[in-house]
A protein has these predicted regions:
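A short beta-strand micro-motif
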Residues: 13-20
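Short, charged beta-turn/beta-strand-edge "cap" motif at the junction between a beta-strand
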Residues: 21-23, 44-49
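Short, compact, well-ordered microdomains
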Residues: 67-101
Length: 101
């Protein structure tokens, strides 16, 4: 790598898809997200209307995929799943890279 100019690959486009929103013991699901919602991540900021606590837990995984990495537990390249930190109703997010048309 050339430290003066950098020879980094262009970051990949990443989107976040809400896969599961389980209900807690009181029968309430996540108040921020619904199954099927899709958010585009642009590295600059948390997507609008996205739960800040969930985003904080997704951030490291977003960066791994954006920079072309892969976790040892991922079965598919460019895709990982992460749960929000709410222990009562952990929303599951699929993070995936994509090509822009």
């Amino acid at each position: 790598m050339d430290r003066e100019y950098g020879t980094f690959q262009k970051p990949k486009k990443v989107r976040i898809v809400v896969e599961k929103c389980p209900k807690n013991e009181a029968g309430r699901a996540c108040h921020c997200h619904e199954v099927g919602q899709v958010f585009t991540f642009d590295f600059e900021q948390c997507p609008q209307d996205f739960c800040a606590a969930a985003f904080h837990s997704l951030w490291p995984q977003l960066r791994v995929l954006e920079l072309g990495g892969r976790h040892p537990w991922d079965s598919q390249e460019g895709v990982t799943r992460v749960a929000c930190p709410d222990p009562g109703k952990p929303t599951i997010f699929r993070i995936e890279t994509y090509e822009e048309d």
